[in-house]
Amino acid sequence: MLKLLSLMVPLASAAVIHRRDANISAIASEWNSTSNSSSSLSLNRPAVHYSPEEGWMNDPNGLWYDAKEEDWHIYYQYYPDAPHWGLPLTWGHAVSKDLTVWDEQGVAFGPEFETAGAFSGSMVIDYNNTSGFFNSSTDPRQRVVAIWTLDYSGSETQQLSYSHDGGYTFTEYSDNPVLDIDSDAFRDPKVFWYQGEDSESEGNWVMTVAEADRFSVLIYSSPDLKNWTLESNFSREGYLGYNYECPGLVKVPYVKNTTYASAPGSNITSSGPLHPNSTVSFSNSSSIAWNASSVPLNITLSNSTLVDETSQLEEVGYAWVMIVSFNPGSILGGSGTEYFIGDFNGTHFEPLDKQTRFLDLGKDYYALQTFFNTPNEVDVLGIAWASNWQYANQVPTDPWRSSMSLVRNFTITEYNINSNTTALVLNSQPVLDFTSLRKNGTSYTLENLTLNSSSHEVLEFEDPTGVFEFSLEYSVNFTGIHNWVFTDLSLYFQGDKDSDEYLRLGYEANSKQFFLDRGHSNIPFVQENPFFTQRLSVSNPPSSNSSTFDVYGIVDRNIIELYFNNGTVTSTNTFFFSTGNNIGSIIVKSGVDDVYEIESLKVNQFYVD
């Protein structure tokens, strides 16, 4: 069963024109005077998925952690004047202490011209002042530089802006642009610091940026963020769609359980694929470290100091992951995000295989970006836009439009595709801080129940908030099914005010697929928009090649995130009920007898303080 991770850390008036020569502090002040960030949430607006109170939002940009103030910062594509995409497009800004509840900050910066866009980019912390933008008055932990795309007059170029106040206001670099290849499809730079394997190397900045309509991710290096050298390109890999967007390259922990045999004071042997290059000795130690195929591993023995047995240990190495979004042309229609697992030597990325891997198998998960840094400098955290360009401008919300996904923690793990094949996968788990959430008394557990067609279980919520988590473990008796019968386990998430509006999700044994039906709504958009796919499914193999399946879900008013098999498969989708019709009950049923057993169903409803 998947567990939520607790993070380990101690609008604008239509008359406002966001221009470079405008005073950004004044813009922020005016925004704050016309928007009450502490006001209660709209009835259908998500509570723990970030969304601006007003205006349009799309791709996440510039994610970083302020170690001085212990604040998390996200920026995003933002048009504050209407709930649809428009120009001038700016960078919005929000801050959080816990990655769960966000404080909206308004516009961080924007382009000079009203017909221009400050398109997507990233944020770095220039600790060592390689750019020369800072002096001793700015704490090294707050020396943030934004690298972003200016889209204007048929050209896309890369720009720099820097902040002297911890990311709240920005000054544009006077010698912009820092990269111009005479292209109208050259965008979305993601920058990180590359140190290399040699701890004595000076290191340098690395940028991935999309040459969108050529299906290329260009890889540049720089000593100072201002002067860039093209090193290589990663091109025409995986699923192309119409064009590449929002690339990113990140070093991700690789975690694998394997078998070891040992005795106190002696050598250790490992059966795993990432075993030591040479013999490793220890004496009553609870942890060791080794190198395997030049991949550093930090090993923690599962039985602490009692090591005189054969048991399991957790191998932790790393691999590099190239993330590429594409739009349109996803296999589900519209927007999609894929990734490649491989190796990076500072100039070139090489995937380990030709497998195309999709980051999320739902309809509403796009443009993932990872945080530049985290408190322990090991965790890889990221956030995506929870919408789809096929219909994002038309979804029935007002005065805001669209939300972000939950923050996720990423690791590379092994995944049983079927009983004979194991592959690597980018595993993801949601990050929420429960200290920001409180139960409202609705907590329900259902255990050891065999379903039949003549009865069903009903879970009633008290004072429905529309925000809850659920964890479902179930087993399937495959010997008792007929292939001509729709053999379902179904959960109906029904609206409290109108039960004709509901989500239906569950599993069908013949197809071995988990399904979601989001089409039962009275909202015209849901019924009439042909791109708002009503019925979706994902392959859901059992856990550890057994007959037991598990799914964890978070429902947040108009969005549902599903995590299968401890996060090896995910599906993120929006849904839309009538205003204020929060989910008030869950009905569990099956159309067949003695096929499904509910081993455990746990539901907790939350308020947000």
UniProtKB/Swiss-Prot annotation:
Q: Which SMART domains match?
A: Glyco_32
Q: What glycosylation sites does the entry record?
A: 23, 32, 36, 128-129, 135, 227, 233, 257, 267, 277, 284, 291, 298, 303, 345, 409, 420, 440, 448, 452, 477, 545, 566
Question: CDD domains given for it?
Answer: GH32_Inu-like (cd18622)
Q: Which reaction does it catalyse?
A: Hydrolysis of terminal non-reducing beta-D-fructofuranoside residues in beta-D-fructofuranosides
Question: Which Pfam family, an example, fits this chain?
Answer: Glyco_hydro_32C
InterPro entries for the chain: ConA-like_dom_sf (IPR013320), Glyco_hydro_32 (IPR001362), Glyco_hydro_32_AS (IPR018053), Glyco_hydro_32_C (IPR013189), Glyco_hydro_32_N (IPR013148), Glyco_hydro_beta-prop_sf (IPR023296)
Q: Give the signal sequence positions.
A: 1-14
The UniProt record lists the EC number as 3.2.1.26
Q: Which Gene3D superfamilies match?
A: Exo-inulinase, domain 1, Glycosyl hydrolase domain, family 43
Cellular component, GO, one term: extracellular region
Q: What class of enzyme is it?
A: hydrolase
Tell me the Gene Ontology biological-process terms attached to this UniProt entry: sucrose catabolic process
Annotated catalytic residues:
D59
Q: Name one GO molecular function term.
A: sucrose alpha-glucosidase activity
Tell me the residue numbers annotated for binding substrate. Answer: W56, M57, N58, D59, Q77, F119, S120, R187, D188, E245, W389
| Record-annotated disulphide pairs | none
Keywords in alphabetical order, please.
Glycoprotein, Glycosidase, Hydrolase, Signal
Family designation = Belongs to the glycosyl hydrolase 32 family.
Matching entries from PANTHER family are given as: EXOINULINASE INUD (AFU_ORTHOLOGUE AFUA_5G00480), INVERTASE 2
Name this protein carries in UniProt = Invertase
Supply the source organism for this entry: Kluyveromyces lactis (strain ATCC 8585 / CBS 2359 / DSM 70799 / NBRC 1267 / NRRL Y-1140 / WM37) (Yeast)
